[in-house]
């Protein structure tokens, strides 16, 4: 079971060619699932049609938009209420980060992705924001304040996602919701780069650890590739 951004690919980038070939062969001999906050079109852009089809199931939008071989099997429709939306607008307008590239609110099935720098940012603007956020912890601050102000009242939760985003869903509609489909699996191995508290892999990682499964909190896709290669060598 794999996250995409920062786990199989560089953030918002495409899968490495050599890793892609290795991962396709891995998919042929294992039950492989993807669970990502990104929508279907972005996931296909990142991993490619062949990998997308080779997975037994892809859980897009944190499990709120689900596909098997490009056929949609489930979609959760949801819209963020006005008050928390206005809070995010206010944080955007008063952010100390000067570069606002546009497309700051990305509504996806069952979730909203919010970004201060914006999804239209250039690669350099993304790097600049990563440095800014690493120092100022802006996304962590927004997410924590958001959850305190709106979490219980609106039954919603916010988590830090990817390098520049914040994912907002209804409570119980994060990535951990997909585990209801895996009750018959005796062994699950999960790979994710945002397994820390406040990250959008945290809830599913903690649920799996609590059930006796294995979680690899990876640093990047190179780390994932290394671990999978070592697992393959051990099994042969």
Predicted segments, located by residue:
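A short, Lys/Arg-enriched amphipathic alpha-helix followed by its capping loop at the start of a domain
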Residues: 1, 18-30, 149, 185, ...
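Asp-based phosphoryl-transfer active-site loop
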Residues: 1-14, 34, 201
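Active-site phosphate-binding/coordination module
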Residues: 14-104
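Mg2+-dependent phosphoryl-transfer enzymes with acidic/Ser/Thr/Gly-rich catalytic loops
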Residues: 15-16, 169-236
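Substrate-recognition element of Asp-dependent hydrolases with the DxDx(T/V) motif
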Residues: 24-46, 58, 103-116, 158-162, ...
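A generic structural motif
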Residues: 28-31, 153-157, 186, 210-214
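Short, solvent-exposed loop/turn segments at secondary-structure junctions
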Residues: 39-40, 65, 118-121, 164-165, ...
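Conserved acidic, metal-coordinating active-site core of Asp-based
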Residues: 99-189
């Amino acid at each position: 079971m794999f996250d995409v951004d920062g786990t199989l690919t560089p953030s918002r980038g495409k899968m490495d060619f050599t890793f892609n070939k290795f991962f396709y062969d891995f998919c042929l001999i294992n039950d492989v699932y993807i669970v990502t906050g990104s929508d279907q079109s972005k996931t296909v852009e990142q991993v490619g049609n062949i990998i997308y089809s080779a997975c037994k199931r892809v859980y897009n939008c944190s499990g709120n938009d689900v596909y098997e071989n490009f056929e949609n099997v489930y979609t959760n429709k949801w819209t963020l209420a006005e008050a928390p939306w206005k809070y995010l607008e206010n944080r955007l307008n008063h952010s100390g980060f000067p570069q606002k590239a546009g497309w700051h609110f990305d509504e996806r099935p069952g979730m909203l992705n919010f970004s201060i720098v914006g999804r239209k940012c250039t690669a350099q603007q993304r790097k600049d924001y990563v440095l800014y956020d690493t120092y100022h912890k802006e996304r962590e601050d927004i997410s924590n304040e958001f959850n305190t102000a709106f979490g219980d009242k609106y039954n919603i939760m916010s988590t830090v996602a990817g390098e520049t985003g914040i994912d907002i869903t209804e409570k119980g509609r994060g990535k951990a919701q997909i585990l209801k489909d895996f009750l018959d699996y005796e062994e699950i191995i999960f790979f994710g780069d945002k397994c820390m508290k406040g990250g959008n892999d945290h809830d599913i990682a903690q649920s799996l650890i609590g059930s006796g499964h294995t979680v690899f909190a990876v640093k990047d896709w190179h780390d994932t590739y290394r671990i999978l290669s070592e697992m393959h060598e051990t099994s042969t």
